[in-house]
């Protein structure tokens, strides 16, 4: 494993310097391109709720200054001598992972996201001991293992959030058999219609599932049905609507990050139904045992995805023309966008125009 300790490249970016979370211009150093590395000119970077948690140190682990961003797309400007899969000019992306041990059981199965030594794209510790900086910056140096190709059919701006939101829902949908050919016609419930939820709806429809959106907001029904082509919409606070859906769904993807009870949601599953949690509430969710026991139901969780799955997902998105619905923001409006993101005032993902052209 080649390590490149010489951080000599000066890079301009945007960072939070303290728990106020205010993003300011920040000049820092990145490592030189190593033999296994790919240097990328950043074009676009999506804004994730995780960025909010890190800039405000909500989890008590932020290492300031922190340069956020793990939904990164751009163009290759340099490749190392050991890099065979990429060349200068390629359209590429980098998601949540900067490094892993490459040798454990998880890495050997391309489940790098579950490696004990995983290093995140930002606020992580890289192999050489340096702190990782994310995609709110003009360029990035990434190990070849953690770079994916972006199909020519996908715009770089709308593809960026797929590297987090997309893979976060794709991975469990694949692992639990929702995207297999024989799953067509089965019934999927998507709890929450935000950055993750709207992509889950798109995957479900692309693979022939009957999709029901489950939301606390009646105002989202038109959006779900008309724009995302959901087959059904249920207001989770309406007891009559929820009771009418009892034992009707084969699968449920719960994308909600707010604390909520899983009991009413579990009742919507058929016997042997599967509920997958991908949202991360700050407080524990309520999980009653009776709906599990009497319905032989399964609850599981999932955290992003490995690199093989991420490339597979991106290729499928290229084939089915699946992208995220986004709002482009300029670098001088990052703080405004973060404030709106904190209020969930976005449909459905902000993407920073770092150095790109939305027509790419």
Curated annotation (Swiss-Prot):
GO terms for biological process: lignin biosynthetic process. Zn(2+) 2 binds at residues 101, 104, 107, 115. GO terms for molecular function: cinnamyl-alcohol dehydrogenase activity; coniferyl-alcohol dehydrogenase activity; zinc ion binding. The keyword Zinc applies. Its EC number is 1.1.1.195. It comes from the Eukaryota. Binds 2 Zn(2+) ions per subunit. Zn(2+) 1 binds at residues 48, 70-71, 164. SUPFAM superfamilies: GroES-like, NAD(P)-binding Rossmann-fold domains. It catalyses: (E)-cinnamyl alcohol + NADP(+) = (E)-cinnamaldehyde + NADPH + H(+); (E)-coniferol + NADP(+) = (E)-coniferaldehyde + NADPH + H(+); (E)-sinapyl alcohol + NADP(+) = (E)-sinapaldehyde + NADPH + H(+); (E)-4-coumaroyl alcohol + NADP(+) = (E)-4-coumaraldehyde + NADPH + H(+). Its cofactor is Zn(2+). Pathway: Aromatic compound metabolism; phenylpropanoid biosynthesis. Keywords: Lignin biosynthesis, Metal-binding, NADP, Oxidoreductase, Zinc. It is an enzyme of class 1 (oxidoreductase). InterPro entries: ADH-like_C, ADH-like_N, ADH_Zn_CS, CAD-like, GroES-like_sf, NAD(P)-bd_dom_sf, PKS_ER. NADP(+) binds at residues 50, 168, 192-197, 215-220, 255, 279, 302-304. Homodimer. Belongs to the zinc-containing alcohol dehydrogenase family. Involved in lignin biosynthesis. Catalyzes the final step specific for the production of lignin monomers. Catalyzes the NADPH-dependent reduction of coniferaldehyde, 5-hydroxyconiferaldehyde, sinapaldehyde, 4-coumaraldehyde and caffeyl aldehyde to their respective alcohols. This is Probable cinnamyl alcohol dehydrogenase 6. The gene is CAD6.
